[in-house]
């Protein structure tokens, strides 16, 4: 099978001069996750509009009502959410910002590396280097910025990045580019006995660093793109090697779900941009229990961004398979936390 490089690295040169990392207020790395007691409120999804809001609530009520044909036991109430473009904004992708952060960090510590590839191409914004080098050059960059360190070191760097990073174009902390309606949905599902997972094309460790603080999802409930690991006995740690073990995108998402979760979800949410969530939604729909699929349509240029896939693959798949499409413009009363 032909290897594919995750899309979040393709635009790194475009954001090289946009990213600003500065120290923000002490709560910059935090966001307000709606409490899981939200389901006990009269309105568990206050940022959602009908009819989609009602359809979600009706589904949850159906599968959680004991004694009915559609009842799903708590152990089987698995919900999987994509991250980029589904739980937070993706223009630019946070993974791109982190890759730049790491390049800057590395060349500051060792200036001589700024004259060597792939760092030279990033520093000089040499787009042709990556276009000509293709997959090999991109994997080289990924390996150089995301591996060669212990898991503890990587997590420390990731948390420092999230504590200081400012999102380009909006001048807000990363915690402020999460989607408020989705925070409510996550809390509502958990309060209804669901276990919520993130299934992301992004690197698993980067998302694990903030999944709990941003979404109330513990790190052991994050599935994502992974590098190969090796155990180092001398310091009893796990080192990351510059080779991708699982690309958790498209057909890789069901594989990741099976590897980490071990069963099909009954609820899944993704978004349109690259067709990366189609297979996850299909996998979810094949569950023998009643299931529910959501695809976020980025059609609100005023409050977020407007972009579509060239072939509209995700939206076409949603229509064909009778999944639910979230119109950001029409279905969400608000988009970002206030």
Description of each model-found segment:
Residues 1-9:
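Bacterial N-terminal signal peptides that target proteins for export
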Residues 17-20:
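C-terminal motif of bacterial Sec signal peptides marking the signal peptidase cleavage site
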Residues 25-47, 61, 76, 155-338:
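C-terminal cap/substrate-recognition subdomain and adjoining C-terminal extension
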Residues 40-82:
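Mature N-terminal segment immediately following signal peptide/propeptide cleavage
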Residues 66-73, 91, 110-116, 196-201, ...:
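Surface-exposed patches in mature extracellular/periplasmic domains of secreted proteins
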Residues 77-92, 281:
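Asp-based phosphoryl-transfer active-site loop
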Residues 93-94, 98-176, 180:
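A metal-dependent, Asp-based hydrolase signature
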């Amino acid at each position: 099978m032909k290897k594919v490089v995750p899309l979040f690295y393709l635009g790194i040169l475009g954001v090289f001069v946009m990213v600003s990392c500065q120290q923000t207020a002490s709560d910059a790395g935090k966001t307000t996750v709606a409490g899981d007691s939200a389901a006990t409120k009269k309105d568990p999804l206050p940022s959602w509009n009908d009819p989609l809001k009602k359809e979600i609530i009706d589904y949850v009520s159906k599968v959680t009502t004991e004694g009915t044909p559609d009842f799903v036991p708590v152990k089987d109430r698995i919900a999987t959410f994509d991250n980029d473009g589904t739980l937070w904004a993706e223009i630019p992708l946070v993974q791109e910002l982190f890759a730049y952060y790491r390049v800057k960090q590395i060349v500051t510590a060792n200036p001589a590396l700024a004259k060597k590839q792939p760092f030279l191409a990033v520093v000089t914004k040499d787009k042709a280097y990556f276009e000509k080098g293709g997959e090999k050059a991109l994997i080289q960059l990924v390996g150089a910025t995301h591996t060669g360190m212990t898991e503890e070191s990587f997590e420390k760097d990731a948390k420092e990045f999230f504590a200081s990073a400012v999102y380009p174009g909006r001048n807000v902390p990363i915690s402020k580019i999460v989607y408020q309606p989705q925070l409510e949905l996550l809390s509502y599902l958990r309060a209804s006995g669901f276990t919520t997972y993130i299934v992301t094309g992004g690197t698993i460790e980067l998302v694990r660093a903030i999944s709990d603080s941003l979404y109330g999802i513990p790190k052991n409930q994050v599935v994502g793109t992974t590098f190969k690991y090796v155990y180092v006995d001398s310091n009893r740690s796990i080192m990351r090697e510059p080779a991708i073990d699982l690309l958790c995108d498209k057909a890789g998402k069901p594989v990741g779900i099976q590897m980490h979760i071990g069963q099909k979800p009954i609820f899944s949410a993704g978004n349109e941009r690259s067709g990366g969530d189609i297979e996850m939604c299909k996998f979810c729909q094949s569950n023998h229990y009643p299931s529910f699929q959501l695809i976020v349509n980025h059609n609100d240029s005023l409050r977020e961004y407007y972009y579509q896939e060239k072939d509209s693959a995700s939206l076409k798949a949603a229509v064909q398979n009778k999944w639910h499409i979230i119109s950001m413009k029409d279905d969400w009363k608000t988009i970002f936390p206030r």
